[in-house]
From Swiss-Prot:
Enhances GTPase-activating protein (GAP) activity of regulator of G protein signaling (RGS) proteins, such as RGS7 and RGS9, hence involved in the termination of the signaling initiated by the G protein coupled receptors (GPCRs) by accelerating the GTP hydrolysis on the G-alpha subunits, thereby promoting their inactivation. Increases RGS7 GTPase-activating protein (GAP) activity, thereby regulating mood and cognition. Increases RGS9 GTPase-activating protein (GAP) activity, hence contributes to the deactivation of G protein signaling initiated by D(2) dopamine receptors. GO terms for cellular component: membrane. It comes from Pongo abelii (Sumatran orangutan). SUPFAM superfamilies: WD40 repeat-like. InterPro entries: G-protein_beta_WD-40_rep, Gprotein_B, Guanine_nucleotide-bd_bsu, WD40/YVTN_repeat-like_dom_sf, WD40_repeat_CS, WD40_repeat_dom_sf, WD40_rpt. Gene3D superfamilies: YVTN repeat-like/Quinoprotein amine dehydrogenase. Component of a complex composed of RGS9 (isoform RGS9-1), GNB5 and RGS9BP; within this complex, the presence of GNB5 stabilizes both itself and RGS9 and increases RGS9 GTPase-activating protein (GAP) activity. Interacts with RGS7, forming the RGS7-GNB5 complex; within this complex, the presence of GNB5 increases RGS7 GTPase-activating protein (GAP) activity. Interacts with GPR158; promotes the GTPase activator activity of the RGS7-GNB5 complex in absence of glycine, in contrast GTPase activator activity of the RGS7-GNB5 complex is inhibited in presence of glycine. Interacts with RGS6. Belongs to the WD repeat G protein beta family. GO terms for molecular function: G-protein gamma-subunit binding; protein-folding chaperone binding. Keywords: Membrane, Repeat, Transducer, WD repeat. This is Guanine nucleotide-binding protein subunit beta-5. The keyword Hydrolase does not apply.
Length: 353
């Protein structure tokens, strides 16, 4: 028995070293293709002009830290979730609250709007993803119509509907992502590969979007094929947890924001990191990132209460937006690109334009 154990250990060690040497060879091959940096290519591109954006609306109503938010496809409504256990649907034009749900747990870390605008999904420390249909009958009890869709073995960190109301993608502290059928609550596909908590995910922007990207506490960003459940690309250049990932509008690249105080851009076709957005003066982590509709700007919320706006091509900072009185936890550009909304630990959401 002892010799068997020894053989197993030797085999494992040799497999590990083989994997490491293959990794090294892959890195060498990747390095050969690195002929030019993005900012060098962008030198001939005209610089951006004067950039002015300010808070147009402040949404107040949460009794604790705002943890997540999402826009409705109608470009007007916003859903937000908070540490107070409440999920609120807002009209961003009038700042009125249209719906409010009290969850059975605090720390509602994830919320999402269904593509049809007729339902919302949310979850957090209850390890579940719950879907609530939205109706405008004021007497109807939303909680009674709740559907428990996803069950993880640890907290729910992110959720997103696919291109229909019928399927939902979740990320969890149990180190997995999963695809669920909303109607039956059945698990359709699970995605294993992260070595620690998965903190964020984003769906590829195409209509046939069969891939998504996830990031987590193992400092890895992974691109997944939803049909096979396999990881098709992985990027490991961050030095700390990845808090946010977001696809470039074309779907050919994605950005990430991390506790290492940098945001990074990864090109999927070049299979490598092509830009780092950082400054020596930025020492706090980036909690949330999103692109402008054109893809030229990257908005990033930080733990030092600011929002930095980066020129994606040139890698330079175009603007800093002040207003929040605590760390910015979530940030999303509206579907028509005319505004973006940020949520913060100061209990408020702000709409900027």
């Amino acid at each position: 028995m002892a010799t068997e154990g020894l053989h197993e250990n030797e085999t494992l060690a040799s497999l590990k070293s083989e994997a490491e040497s293959l990794k090294g060879k892959l890195e060498e091959e990747r390095a050969k293709l690195r002929d030019v940096e993005l900012h060098q290519v962008a030198e001939r591109v005209e610089a951006l002009g004067q950039f002015v954006m300010k808070t147009r609306r402040t949404l107040k109503g949460h009794g604790n830290k705002v943890l997540c938010m999402d826009w409705c496809k109608d470009k007007r409504r916003i859903v937000s979730s908070s540490q107070d256990g409440k999920v609120i649907v807002w009209d961003s034009f009038t700042t009125n609250k249209e719906h409010a749900v009290t969850m059975p747990c605090t720390w509602v870390m994830a919320c999402a709007y269904a593509p049809s605008g007729c339902a919302i999904a949310c979850g957090g420390l209850d390890n579940k993803c719950s879907v609530y249909p939205l109706t405008f009958d004021k007497n109807e009890n939303m909680a009674a119509k709740k559907k428990s869709v996803a069950m993880h073995t640890n907290y729910l960190s992110a959720c997103s509907f696919t291109n229909s109301d019928m399927q939902i993608l979740t990320a969890s502290g149990d180190g997995t992502c999963a695809l669920w059928d909303v109607e039956s609550g059945q698990l359709l596909q699970s995605f294993h590969g992260h070595g620690a908590d998965v903190l964020c995910l984003d769906l590829a922007p195409s209509e046939t979007g069969n891939t998504f990207v996830s990031g987590g506490c193992d400092k890895k960003a992974m691109v997944w094929d939803m049909r096979s459940g396999q990881c098709v690309q992985a990027f490991e250049t961050h030095e700390s947890d990845i808090n946010s990932v977001r696809y470039y509008p074309s779907g050919d690249a994605f950005a990430s924001g991390s506790d290492d105080a940098t945001c990074r851009l990864y090109d999927l076709r070049a299979d490598r990191e092509v830009a780092i957005y950082s400054k020596e003066s930025i020492i706090f982590g980036a909690s949330s990132v999103d692109f402008s509709l054109s893809g030229r700007l990257l908005f990033a919320g930080y733990n030092d209460y600011t929002i930095n706006v980066w020129d994606v091509l040139k890698g330079s900072r175009v603007s800093i937006l002040f207003g929040h009185e605590n760390r910015v936890s979530t940030l999303r550009v509206s579907p028509d690109g005319t505004a973006f909304c940020s949520g913060s630990w100061d209990h408020t959401l702000r709409v900027w334009a």
